[in-house]
Amino acid sequence: DLPFSVKLPNALDPHLRIRDYGVGMTEDVVYDVYINYMKSDKTDTNSETGCFGIGSKTPLAYADQFNITTYNDGTMTMYALVKSEDGVPELNEFGSWDTQEDNGVEISFSVKEDDFNKFSNRAVEVYKYFNTRPEVSGNGDFAYPERKDIISGDTWRISKGSYSDNTVVVMGNVAYPVDVWQFEYDSKERGFLHNNAVIEVPIGDLNVAPSREALEYNEHTLKGISKAIDRVMAEIADSIGVRFAKANSWWQAKAIQREIVREIKGIGSIEELSMFNGRSLDDYPELY
C-alpha cells in the first residue's frame, strides 16, 4: 500500500496536513460526505474503517474550520468546511486549478503553537500501530519507540513490560486498550490481558463507541476478545513446545520453563506444556 503523508505543525507552517493517494473525491462526493452528518461511504463494508458518518467532520472538534483539497485526474479543487454560529457546518468552494499531483485528498487545519508537541506525540501513539505507517514530516524529532518483542505471531506480539501493562487490540489500524475489569477475576482472559500485548482483529469482530476512542463492551465485543485471546494462546502453546524441544537436558528445560513464566502472563498451566523427552518436568527434580 502507498502510505499517506502527514505534515506535522511547526513554526514555519502551523497547519496539520494529512494527504492520501487514493481515488480522490468528486464534487458530488465532497458535498455528500461533508454536509450530511451520519453519512458514510463505509456503512456496508468491513474492509475499511468507518461507517458512523462523523469521522470526516472531526477536525471541527478542534478548529472552527478546516480545508479540503481534492486531486482528481489533473484537477485540484479547494474547499473549506466552516462551523457556523449555530454550529451547522457550511461548505465553501474556492475554485479549481490544473495540477500534476497524484489523485487523492488532503485535509488541513491550523494548530495552536502550544499544541505542536501534543500533535506530534499523539501521532506517535496512533501511527505506531498502523500496518502501513505514514510518511511523517515537519518535526525532525519524530520517531517511533523501539519495540522489544518477547514472542510474536503474524497478527500479535507480546513485548517487554510490567504487570501494570495491559493488552491492546487493533482493529482497522485503530488501537483500543482492553479493560481487564470487564472479565471475571480468575478468567483466562483477565490473566492474559496483563501482558504488554498487541492483537490485531478483523474489522467487525468488536464493537466500538461512536467516538472511536474506546470499545463498547457488549456481548459481541467480549466474545470477540475471548476468541482473539484463545487464538493467541494456542499459537503461544505451539511456540513454547518448540522451545522445549530444543532443550538438551532437563536442567535446560527447567530454565526455559522459568524464563517463560517470567516473560508471559496468563497462558494457562505452564506445567502442562513443560516437557522434556516426552516427560513432564514435574517428574524431574526442582531447579535451584
Residues covered by each model-derived region:
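A generic structural motif
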Residues: 21-22, 109-115, 207, 214
